[in-house]
Amino acid sequence: MHPGVNGKKFPDKPAVIMAGSEKVITHGELNELSNQGAHLFRSLGLKPGDSIAIMLENHFLFFPIIFAAWRSGLRYTTISWRLQPSEVEYIVKDCEAKILITSKFLEETAKDLNKVLDGVHKFMLDGDTDGYESYEQATEGMSKDVIEDECQGGSMLYSSGTTGKPKGVKRELPLTPLPYKAGEEDPGLARVLLLYGAGEESIYLSPAPLYHAAPLNFNTGFLAAGGTSIILEKFDEEKALESIEKYKVTHSQWVPTMFVRFLKVDPSIRTQYDLSSHQVAIHAAAPCPVAVKEQMIDWWGPILHEYYAGTEYNGITMINSQEWLEHKGSVGRPLFGTLHILDDDGEELPVGEVGGVYFGGETATTFEYHNDEEKTKSAMTEQGYSSLGDVGYLDEDGFLYLTDRKSFMIISGGVNIYPKETEDLLVMHPKVADVAVFGVPNEEMGEEVKAVVQPVDLSEAGPALEAELIAYCKENISSIKSPRSIDFEEELPRHPTGKLYKRLLKDKYWK
């Protein structure tokens, strides 16, 4: 569906509701605001295929800006507002953005960027500052009607950089004239939304940062379907539960670290909320420990739907709760793309053997890494298969199990160790809030297993807790997979989507 169609069909129906401020944008307003943004972009000379960058917190004008770029045929790059100015500068320049849109909330970063972003037109929401125009004032006088050359744009999002510098994932823009004719919608997204039952009656809760691929794509999908998006300004366990009850949420999307935090909420508080409207809880972004998912299904019921995909969107697997209970630990079977498990020589491996996970097949999406031909080539095999860098295996029914990322593998005394199993065990210990496991140098063995733990109570960090956790590991998994030593940190460096910046921890031990 198209924002113009929805805007005419139900102009007064809420499209976006901010859970904290309770600000509302209706479908009619979403259509008009995005048209005004599109006219602004054209007035500044932007043509289909040009790029803009958006660095915003979870702001109520986020989606009017996204749809303005989309219906202008532009590439839009959403950037984490938690990045350092130098990191934002790199992405804005690399994506070749002609416009940067940010907010007063990020004024200090914006001021730093103003010094280094020559030739980029800069706008600010909720005010202005040196070098930035007010976006609201710039669009206020623009027409609310459709631009003459309306056509479909798309995102160029950057990988989170958990193993190196972020790279833009670039696909050919559709530039399909709008509004859509029947059958012209993105077939991959349409299929996913159909499976989840997205429609005009859907009320979708979005608790994660909107700049990330999953919240961005699911929100735009549910809005295009005529639904309502409930946006949490930031994730809070009780606010999320309260929002499900208050707005009668039907669909939601999470990451495993949110589940871990949910499960640490006192049971007496959990049971205060009516979650009966909740039909579909989607999760991805990082592997979910089996014990965590078991407890979430026990609590919420068999409404959890997991998928495995990346910003590259070169393939996707899906699994519902019933399938998962029969294949615990799996991330599903391919929805599109075909799965291949390959050894280091690119040869197919049999069922049950661990190797690199690759997507291929005619229905897999083709992509390239913007301005990085070498990285694009390294992600592809001679057969044309592409990988997200994960390691795993297939069972006899074709279900995929992820073992870990290839770059995280520890080689100790010639034995390959994947730290995910150790992490999944440690995170379930009642005194552990978060954990990272990786290899550190060992003169005799090459590498040894190291854990860095974020304790629930920082005052307990020390030799006694270290000994307790190491003993706990050795009681439940083999000693070779158990950490030789454990260090403690107040907080681990996680991306807001739940991905762990393990290299930031690991690099300290390899210098």
Descriptions of predicted regions:
Residues S155-L157, G161, A224-A225, V249-W254, ...:
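Gly/Ser/Thr-rich phosphate-binding loop
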Residues K13, G28-A53, L83-P85, E89, ...:
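ANL superfamily AMP-binding
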Residues F62, L83, L100, E242, ...:
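AMP-binding/adenylate-forming catalytic core of the ANL superfamily
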Residues P177-P207, Y211-H251, V265:
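Conserved AMP-binding/adenylation subdomain of ANL enzymes
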Residues F67-S72, D94, H212, L223-A224:
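Short hydrophobic alpha-helices that are characteristic scaffold elements of the AMP-binding
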Residues H2-T26, G127:
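AMP-dependent adenylate-forming
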Residues G20-K23, H39-S86, N416:
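Conserved AMP-binding/adenylate-forming
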Residues G20, E108-L157, K165, R171-G188, ...:
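ANL superfamily adenylate-forming
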